[in-house]
Every structure is written in C-alpha cells, then in structure tokens.
Amino acid sequence: MTNRLELSGVIAKDPKRSQSPAGVPHCHFVLEHRSYQREADLPRQVYCYINVVSSGKGLQVLTQDLAVGVHTKVAGFISYQTGRNGIGKLVLHADHIEIICSGD
C-alpha cells in the first residue's frame, strides 16, 4: 500500500520539541499550505492546515531553524491520531524536511 505525501507551505505554529521516554527526539509543528491547482480543467484555490511530526536524531538538526513564517517542504507518511480530548486528526510523519525560504 502506498502512503506518501509531499507538501510545501508555511510554518503556522511554533514548533514544539519533546523527547520520548526512550530518548527519541520529536518536533511537532503545523504546516499551512495555499496554492492553485487544476481540477476538471478549471483553476481551484487549495488550502490545508496539517499537523506534522518529525522524529529521530537525523531530523533533529533540520528542525532547528523551523519557526513561524518559514517556508518549508515536508515529505513523509500520514497517519490518524486521536488526541487526549478524543478528537482525531491526520498527522504527517515527516522523514524529509527542506527549508525553502526563511520567514525573515
């Protein structure tokens, strides 16, 4: 089964860094994507807001420069997660992060 998503956008919320009990570093942030796509030969404005998590020491260096307003491209797989409040959401588990342009 294929499960791969690549999305570019702007960091919309300050990244939150944490570490699992096993010592695995995590970085959670929200990516806001806006673009125009073609559907049925017509232009369509597209918008999405997705939670992203990157895990592992290999990605830790790449997340150091992430901040609100930074244009970023992420790739990875998506998974459904249920929060403590019982509300579910799709989360992009990034295995590739590329800063396109800083927010300065």
Swiss-Prot record:
Pfam families: SSB_1 (PF22657). Keywords: DNA replication, DNA-binding, Primosome. It comes from the Bacteria. Residues 1-101 form the SSB domain. InterPro entries: NA-bd_OB-fold (IPR012340), Primosome_PriB/ssb (IPR000424), Prisomal_replication_PriB (IPR023646). GO terms for cellular component: primosome complex. GO terms for biological process: DNA replication, synthesis of primer. One of its GO terms (molecular function) is single-stranded DNA binding. Homodimer. Interacts with PriA and DnaT. Component of the replication restart primosome. Primosome assembly occurs via a 'hand-off' mechanism. PriA binds to replication forks, subsequently PriB then DnaT bind; DnaT then displaces ssDNA to generate the helicase loading substrate. Belongs to the PriB family. Involved in the restart of stalled replication forks, which reloads the replicative helicase on sites other than the origin of replication; the PriA-PriB pathway is the major replication restart pathway. During primosome assembly it facilitates complex formation between PriA and DnaT on DNA; stabilizes PriA on DNA. Stimulates the DNA unwinding activity of PriA helicase. This is Replication restart protein PriB. It comes from Photobacterium profundum (strain SS9).
